[in-house]
A protein has these predicted regions:
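Short glycine/proline- and aromatic-enriched beta-strand/turn motifs that initiate or cap beta-hairpins
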Residues: 25-72, 188-200
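Extracytoplasmic loops and strand-loop junctions of Gram-negative outer membrane beta-barrel proteins
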Residues: 41-45, 126-132, 173-176
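Generic short beta-strand segments
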Residues: 42-44, 76-78, 163-166
């Protein structure tokens, strides 16, 4: 039952993305010469099937245009993981690919980097949502997302997306009764504003 709901959810997202009109005005999208792409996003993860970890995040990305459709740069964020009572600061390389150079366009966003932990309250309790007091030497973070943008001016756009955010953490494994490295996923819905500023 849970698997069917999961498939229906992604089918609905795919239909929305494919239904975005790609024939909007050509001159109302970003112009690479007008500055870098800045994105401020707010995401919220919710428990769904195997994605039972709830997570809320605030992120800022600053990316350079390689052409009209592709950007790459760096980002930083703040995330709170509810079940683990954990706060993290992810730092990453980020890229956006916009399918159309139009006012309204689907896009893909990829992020890869690491994260620091600034607060963890559930450690060494040998419970399901417990973290090891000593973590791995490298904390891997990566995310893949898709969504669409809509320009309200040539330099400002609103964005909506769904993403899969992963954090590599040494967490308690209830099947093995031990702390092991686990890739914890968060299925997130996000809204964002993106903008260009001259020389920034």
């Amino acid at each position: 039952m849970c698997g069917n709901n999961y498939k229906k959810f992604f089918k609905s997202v795919l239909i929305v993305l494919l239904a975005v009109p790609a024939v909007s005005q050509a001159q109302s999208s970003y112009t690479p010469g007008n500055g870098c792409l800045n994105v401020v996003s707010l995401t919220s993860g919710f428990g769904l099937c195997d994605y039972e970890i709830q997570c809320s995040s605030l992120n800022y990305m600053h990316e350079k245009f390689l052409n009209e459709n592709l950007t790459i740069g760096a980002g930083v964020g703040y995330s709170y993981h509810k079940q683990y009572r954990l706060s993290t600061i992810p730092v990453y390389v980020s890229t956006h690919f916009f399918l159309f150079d139009k006012r309204c366009s689907p896009f893909i966003n990829l992020r890869l980097g690491s994260f620091g932990m600034i607060r963890k309250k559930s450690t060494d309790t040998n419970l399901k949502y417990s973290l090891a007091d000593e973590q791995s030497d490298f904390n891997l973070f990566f995310s893949i997302g898709a969504g669409f943008k809509y320009h309200i001016t040539p330099r400002i756009a609103l964005m909506a997306s769904v993403s899969d955010d992963f954090y590599l953490l040494k967490a308690y494994d209830t099947r093995r009764n031990d702390y092991r490295n686990k890739l914890l996923g968060n299925l997130c819905l996000g809204i964002a504003i993106s903008f260009q500023i001259d020389n920034w």
